[in-house]
Amino acid sequence: MSPETETGATSSVPRSLFDKVWDAHQVRAETAETPGLLYIDLHLVHEVTSPQAFSVLAERGLKVRRPDRTLATIDHATPTLDFAAGETPPYATAAAQNQVETLQSNTAQHGITLHGWGSGHRGVVHVIGPELGATQPGMTIVCGDSHTATHGAFGALAFGIGTTEVGHVLASQCLLQRKPKSMRVTVDGETAAGISAKDIILAIIAEIGVDGGTGCVIEYAGSAIEALDMEGRMTVCNMSIEAGARAGMIAPDETTFAWLEGREQVPTGSEWDAAIDRWRALRSDAGARFDHEVMIDAASIRPMVTWGTAPDTGIAVNAPIPQPRSPSHRKALAYMGLEAGMPVAGTQVDQVFIGSCTNSRITDLREAAAIMSGRRVADGIRALVVPGSVAVRAQAEAEGLDRIFTDAGAEWRQPGCSMCIAMNGDRGEPGQLVVSTSNRNFEGRQGPGVRTVLASPATAAAAAIAGHVIDPAELMEPAHA
């Protein structure tokens, strides 16, 4: 029996969702002198942050302790261009090819399941974990990737780790950790029509700042969060790190259970019934204490875009850019080529990217397709649509979404991280402005000198059609053929 089965244990002291999962996984409690020892239920691995960790195991003659609780895929360095069966994938660099082939070798040596070329579940690691049902409520989940918090949408405690820690988990299935503080962000009320999960999380980060959640695990709560589907909840939790948080979590509910039921790695029969009973206890108790509380009115949220080079520079698409409050804000405005007092709406666009672990799931693609249907990408604009996994791509094609995108003039790509991190050959050119559904708008994130505006799939798709940043509500009505 793994520790995640014990999260429903009763306690006389009101506990938060985070407390319950943390307590159930402590192998050894922390002291003033030493961190606690935390058991890890699921270790996700990809090609970029794992090679050095496997090398350390080889140097020390160690084996992977729990290959059955380790799941690998290739995503960061993989090309998204089509290629024929039997051909070598068109890697951008020899280093990228070496990373993929090294992971293939390491996983084969240690008996780890790898969703590589030819797998029906290859894709972005934070898409395929939930898709397979490997991500489940009450688990502890780690990955050598900043956006591991995505899996917190299922009531799991999920966070990114460094390469050294990747080695620790491979060798021991445990991590030395001090317990973070807790924060609850409550988004109550009803959002306006067309407001997406991406708009909600950009509004949250704009409210609390890029360091507002530092040292904390955030629990997202409130009626607007509960109203989100699972893909939307994953989008919210995905960007917790952009607020400085260690992780983000949402209590599991009937929406969660319905989404998980029948997936490849979830329990079945009586074991499923028992799991549901356990998972229902994964809620913060009445009276549970949080170190910080933030309240946000859902009705106040508008379609959001960023104007600067940090994720907390989100504003409503038609709102004026605020006056700079610091040298970093002045620098950001200069880099972006924008002016305070003017809205981001109307800014000319060069490329649009719809994808990433934030927004590459089937509901994200449907949202973008609804805008693009019957329309054409503006002249001179390049639009890339990159599904999050082979399975997402197949479902989108079954629904005809790929034809909507290609008929509009967008490029329909193979799955991968793609332009989010721009290490696979998908990137912008110096000086170009990219409207992106990814999670980071740092200088050069999508290529040297590239300027990034973060947005929802609907807002990104609308920018591709209009040729400039625009409120997607202006294109919500179906186009006439």
Curated annotation (Swiss-Prot):
InterPro entries: 3-IsopropMal_deHydase_lsu, Acnase/IPM_dHydase_lsu_aba_1/3, Acoase/IPM_deHydtase_lsu_aba, Aconitase_4Fe-4S_BS, Aconitase_4Fe-4S_dom, IPM_dehydratase_rel_enz, IPMI_cat. Catalyzes the isomerization between 2-isopropylmalate and 3-isopropylmalate, via the formation of 2-isopropylmaleate. It catalyses: (2R,3S)-3-isopropylmalate = (2S)-2-isopropylmalate. Binds 1 [4Fe-4S] cluster per subunit. [4Fe-4S] cluster binds at C357, C417, C420. The lineage of its organism: Bacteria, Pseudomonadati, Pseudomonadota, Alphaproteobacteria, Maricaulales. Its EC number is 4.2.1.33. Gene3D superfamilies: Aconitase, domain 3 (3.30.499.10). Its cofactor is [4Fe-4S] cluster. Coiled coil: none annotated. Keywords: 4Fe-4S, Amino-acid biosynthesis, Branched-chain amino acid biosynthesis, Iron, Iron-sulfur, Leucine biosynthesis, Lyase, Metal-binding. Pathway: Amino-acid biosynthesis; L-leucine biosynthesis; L-leucine from 3-methyl-2-oxobutanoate: step 2/4. SUPFAM superfamilies: Aconitase iron-sulfur domain. Heterodimer of LeuC and LeuD. This is 3-isopropylmalate dehydratase large subunit.
